[in-house]
Regions:
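Beta-strand-centric surfaces of beta-sandwich/beta-rich domains
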Residues: 21-244
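Sec-dependent N-terminal signal peptides
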Residues: 5-15
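Sec/Tat signal peptide C-region and signal peptidase I cleavage site
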Residues: 16-20
């Protein structure tokens, strides 16, 4: 009986604390949303293009051009990214890139082809959902990884192809914070492409890093050797080397 009471108390406390985050309004936190309707995410500046109606639902990104999806100063955190494009063939999803810059750095922390970043390796879309990414209808790209920044953030969409992109739809949800939390960490991603691997030689998925951090995951796209066409090609182990 005592165990049951303790269990109920723990569950009740968990539910109560979880729901407390919903109704609690953190002091100094301001939620914002950027899109083509409101590129700056500033308060009171949305729905200006067409007298309050939808007037700027999408943007055009010409071949070789880029577009800033978010540019903010001060501490904050990106909470969610959604976007879709009119051309989702493998060639275009590899040629379109997304870049993230933190704290006014000129070097991006993320510079990855669009399809690969959103969990579609080999730039082939498929329906899927996990805790960080989803593509429920094979036509939209969602990311809900929290991405804090101390002094500023910029997200850039780049069209490196030789084709014009007629439609880019997007929105980015973020929160302006009163100050930086020392327990926060920056989001980084690395993308690699190799035409072949060597038999008996370990392939490095993530280059050696130093400092404190957390590994969130990896998305792999593989063209199997035709020699393994009728058998399982994935033998071997994933090896992690942590703290030396």
């Amino acid at each position: 009986k005592m165990k049951r009471i303790v269990l109920i108390s723990v569950l009740f406390s968990f539910v109560f604390l979880s729901h407390a985050q919903i109704w609690k309004v953190p002091e100094g936190h301001e939620t914002r949303w950027t899109s083509f309707e409101n590129p700056t995410g500033a308060k009171g500046t949305a729905a200006q293009a067409n007298k309050g109606a939808k007037g700027s639902a999408f943007g055009r990104i010409m071949a070789g051009d880029s577009c800033v999806l978010l540019s903010q100063q001060g501490p904050g955190i990106i909470n969610r990214i959604w976007l879709t494009v009119s051309k989702r063939n493998p060639k275009m999803l590899r040629a379109l890139r997304i870049k993230f810059y933190w704290d006014n750095s000129v070097v991006p922390a993320v510079d990855v082809p669009l399809g690969d970043f959103f969990g579609n390796p080999l730039s082939r879309t498929s329906r899927f959902e996990n805790c960080f990414f989803s593509n429920p209808e094979k036509r939209s790209f969602n990311c809900c990884i929290p991405m804090p920044y101390r002094t500023g953030a910029k997200v850039v969409f780049v069209n490196t192809s030789d084709e014009d992109l007629t439609h880019l739809f997007y929105d980015i949800n973020f929160t302006k914070l009163p100050e930086w939390d020392s327990e926060m960490s920056y989001f980084h991603a690395v993308w690699r492409e190799d035409k072949s691997t060597k038999l008996g030689v370990d392939y490095t998925v993530l280059p050696q890093l130093s400092g404190r951090g957390r590994f969130l995951g990896v998305s792999l796209g593989i063209f199997a050797n035709k020699a393994y066409e009728t058998t399982w090609w994935g033998e071997g182990e994933i090896k992690f080397y942590i703290d030396g």
